Amino acid sequence: IKGGMGARPNKDGINAVAAGISNTMNTPIEILELSFPVRIDYYEITPDSGGRGRYRGGCGSRRAWTIVDHNARAAVCLERTKSPPFGVCGGEAGARASIALKLADGSIRPLLTKGGFNAPAGSQILLEVPGAGGYGDASERDSQACARDLQDGYVSAEPD
C-alpha cells in the first residue's frame, strides 16, 4: 500500500507511489486473497490526503481487509502518524497515516502504529497511508488543475 510523493516546484506530487527505500511491496489483491484468509474490501486513493498548494502533494491510499474465518495476528510499522508530511514554500501538509480495527459489532478501535495486534475473525483492518505535502501557496493553483482534481477524485470539494 502506497503513500503520496511531495509536490515539486513545477508539478503536482505523484499519487500512491512506492518509495524505493521503504521496504514495501504492492502485492496484488488476488494474491493476498489466495494466500491468506482475508478479503480486501477496498484499495483506493484517499481523497483530500495530498497537501494543498500551487502544486498539490500526491494523495496517499487506503485499504481495508476483513479477517474471514479465523483469529489473526498482524504487525504494522507506520510513519507520519503524529506529524504530517510537511509542505514547502507555503504548501500545506499532507494527511497523516492511521490504522484502526473495526470489530464485528461496528465499534472502531485505533491501533498502535508500530507493533503487533490481534484481529478477531470478522473484524476489518482499516489502513490509511499518508499523502504528501504541497508546494507553494494554494491560492496560486490553476483553476483548471483544481477542476481536474475534483473530477479525478483527488479532492472532495473545490477550495474556497
Predicted regions and their residues:
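Glycine/proline-enriched, intrinsically flexible loops and inter-domain linkers
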Residues: 1-159
